[in-house]
Amino acid sequence: MKNQICTILGGGGFIGRYLVRNLTKKNYRCIISTRKAFQKGYLKTQATPGAIELIDWNPNNFSELKEAIKNSDVVINLIGILYETRKQKFYNIHSSIPEAAAKICSESDIKKFIHVSAIGASENSKSLYQKSKFQGEVRALENFKNTVVIRPSVVCGTEDNFTNLFSKLSILPVIPVVGINYKFQPILV
């Protein structure tokens, strides 16, 4: 049986590093599509030679995206931003990219598209971040029937900012808890 190929969009980030390590241990061949691939060479050290391919991808170039995805069995979208910049807008990153990836999956022989969203994604949210995440889910699901949406809240791991912050706060006599009515569904990488 041939190794399955998994293309990971945004695979050079915090979640991607752990995901790539686990997938290559299960004999997947990983194509990692990321900005500034020349800075992500360390990812190749996580597996045997040839198991990881890095592709430098401009998120505004969907023909490059098609090239990265076309021979895959599974595509995972990890691309996301927490705040907008002059060049990166929520709508483009969270909605247009998942839509384009899902369309390419439907035109190709892709078995599954896994789209990582966010726990509070909602069309009625006051947050542009949450609205754009919801739009991305809808567009991915509309364009490829084998789309799976994952909605994590906080992602925890040895290098994360969240648990390390709480570790530092633990020396205080009191730890403030804000927003106790919010959903909290952490995932460990």
Residues covered by each model-derived region:
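Conserved glycine-rich Rossmann-like NAD(P)H-binding loop of the short-chain dehydrogenase/reductase
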Residues: 28-38
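Conserved Rossmann-fold NAD(P)-dependent oxidoreductase catalytic core, especially the SDR/UDP-sugar
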Residues: 29, 81-82, 90-143, 147-154
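Structural motif
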Residues: 5, 73-74, 112
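N-terminal Rossmann NAD(P)H-binding glycine-rich loop of SDR-like oxidoreductase domains
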Residues: 4-28
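A conserved pocket-lining segment of Rossmann-fold NAD(P)-dependent short-chain dehydrogenase/reductase
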Residues: 168-189
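Flexible, glycine-rich beta-alpha linker
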Residues: 127, 148-168, 183-185
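NAD(P)H-binding glycine-rich loop region in Rossmannoid oxidoreductase-like domains
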Residues: 38-39, 47-100, 104-107, 119-123
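Short beta-strand/turn micro-motifs composed of small residues
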Residues: 10, 34, 117
